[in-house]
Swiss-Prot record:
It is found in: Mitochondrion membrane. It comes from Mus musculus. This is ATP synthase F(0) complex subunit j, mitochondrial. Subunit j, of the mitochondrial membrane ATP synthase complex (F(1)F(0) ATP synthase or Complex V) that produces ATP from ADP in the presence of a proton gradient across the membrane which is generated by electron transport complexes of the respiratory chain. ATP synthase complex consist of a soluble F(1) head domain - the catalytic core - and a membrane F(1) domain - the membrane proton channel. These two domains are linked by a central stalk rotating inside the F(1) region and a stationary peripheral stalk. Keywords: Membrane, Mitochondrion, Transmembrane, Transmembrane helix. It comes from the Eukaryota. The keyword S-adenosyl-L-methionine does not apply. Component of the ATP synthase complex composed at least of ATP5F1A/subunit alpha, ATP5F1B/subunit beta, ATP5MC1/subunit c (homooctomer), MT-ATP6/subunit a, MT-ATP8/subunit 8, ATP5ME/subunit e, ATP5MF/subunit f, ATP5MG/subunit g, ATP5MK/subunit k, ATP5MJ/subunit j, ATP5F1C/subunit gamma, ATP5F1D/subunit delta, ATP5F1E/subunit epsilon, ATP5PF/subunit F6, ATP5PB/subunit b, ATP5PD/subunit d, ATP5PO/subunit OSCP. Its main location: mitochondrion. PANTHER family: ATP SYNTHASE SUBUNIT ATP5MJ, MITOCHONDRIAL, MITOCHONDRIAL PROTEOLIPID.
Amino acid sequence: MFQTLIQKVWVPMKPYYTQVYQEIWVGVGLMSLIVYKIRSADKRSKALKGPAPAHGHH
C-alpha cells in the first residue's frame, strides 16, 4: 500500500521536489535530526532520574 502511494505521488513529482525543494529537504532533515537528538537526550535524562511515579507504566 505504502509503496504504491510512493509510486503514484513521488515518481511524477520527483524532479520537481529534487530541484525546487532540495534546500528545504536538507533543512527538514537537519530539523528532524535535532528533534531526535533532543528527544533521545530527554529520554536518557529521564531514565537517569528514575521512573516517574505519575506515569506508572514502568
